[in-house]
């Protein structure tokens, strides 16, 4: 199988002497009309990968900022079929690789084979599913594999080396390292043990490492040096847009 477009985008960023930028934005936020304007602005502003959140009524891994934004999107009528239709109309317009991040129940209800086929047709390159354990990910992984889509593993501070090795066997695209215990959201500082665990992740995985959950500023990212290839930021971006800002302004800050 050829190298994932997600891996390629991260490697291109590293070759340019910078970390890969991976913004997260809930599908349909801040509203269904403006969402694609902000998506285009993220892409034009230098995003290497864009994670699009699929709204769900019980987002167990999300902090208050992302959770409220997702609930607002649900109330506005955001759903998978709408996302696929609208993304499909814009297929090929984005340089950034597109990843859908969502919970397993809506994906199961949609049908895993149909999910993978429609995602590929819409220009999506991968999925992150926080509530699917490794042992139960087989059917989803098989459906995604058929269409050349990546299932991005989520690992963190409490993931044992044995389990890291199990995730690494099938890892494609990149590995998402959860930098804190708990839900998403901005933190002023990150736990000191993050570097130690990242060292193990770097040793065990053969795909790029992206750091997320709790990232507030570029300075936090660069403190990790070569242990990290990219950064995922969601809560800070959402808060910026809610306060009247734009994705373009936010990306300019991260690009420096």
Swiss-Prot record:
Keywords assigned: Amino-acid biosynthesis, Aromatic amino acid biosynthesis, Lyase, Tryptophan biosynthesis
GO cellular component term, pick one: cytosol
Catalytic activity annotation: (1S,2R)-1-C-(indol-3-yl)glycerol 3-phosphate + L-serine = D-glyceraldehyde 3-phosphate + L-tryptophan + H2O
Stored Gene3D superfamilies: Aldolase class I (3.20.20.70)
Listed pathway(s): Amino-acid biosynthesis; L-tryptophan biosynthesis; L-tryptophan from chorismate: step 5/5
GO molecular function, one term: tryptophan synthase activity
Pfam families noted in UniProt: Trp_syntA
Active site: 51 (proton acceptor), 62 (proton acceptor)
SUPFAM superfamilies: Ribulose-phoshate binding barrel (SSF51366)
Keyword Amino-acid biosynthesis: yes
Coiled-coil region list: none
EC number: 4.2.1.20
InterPro entries linked: Aldolase_TIM, RibuloseP-bd_barrel, Trp_synthase_alpha_AS, Trp_synthase_suA
UniProt subunit comment: Tetramer of two alpha and two beta chains.
Family membership: Belongs to the TrpA family.
Function text: The alpha subunit is responsible for the aldol cleavage of indoleglycerol phosphate to indole and glyceraldehyde 3-phosphate.
HAMAP family to which the protein is assigned, alphabetical: Trp_synth_alpha
Protein name (Swiss-Prot/TrEMBL): Tryptophan synthase alpha chain
Gene of this entry: trpA
